[in-house]
Amino acid sequence: TRAMACMKHVGFNVAADPTYSVSYMGVNGGLVIVVADDPGLYSSQNEQDTRMVARAAKLPVLEPSDSAEAKEFMKLAFELSEKFDRPFVYRTTTRLAHSQGVVELEERTDVEDKAYVKDIRKNVMMPGNAKLRHVEIEKRNQELAEAANTLPINRVEMCDTKIGVITSGIPYQYVKEALPEASVLKLGLVNPLPKKLIEEFASKVDTLY
């Protein structure tokens, strides 16, 4: 079973109560929370960074950088959500939402539905249960952090080693245009961070941004 919730950054605030709780509960299937941020306030009453909210809620975050990745990352978000029993936040921004690009389609793949399993300790967030789930969520996040170091969506593009840039999302496109000679670590999973991969990349460049 797969489900998706879509909102802007300000709507993510309204959804905070169930979001923080479902982070502890986990999901018996796949759950992706699509949140559209608006850097520059082009059509919003304020600016917010969903990555920070997701970090506080202990939720993993995927951030595509173009139209093709927007499609591929959605599929991956559901797959990772099912694998790690975690809701995944899928962050988009104004520039990504207005972008155009070549997107390759593929045949639809059917996904097996999972039956509802009654589990009060896992699904009812009373204090006694929540304390136990806190331990489990830290364990799952640690497993995901380790996996982040080898995920293909976190990739290194080595060029000149004088300058290295760590980036994600639409800013990746800006970096490639402004500094085509720089080495780049492009993050597709921005929370949790792939610490080992970052350390390895940092050790190979003279100046890191």
Model-derived segments and spans:
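Flexible, low-complexity linker and terminal segments
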Residues: 64-208
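Thiamine diphosphate
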Residues: 1-82
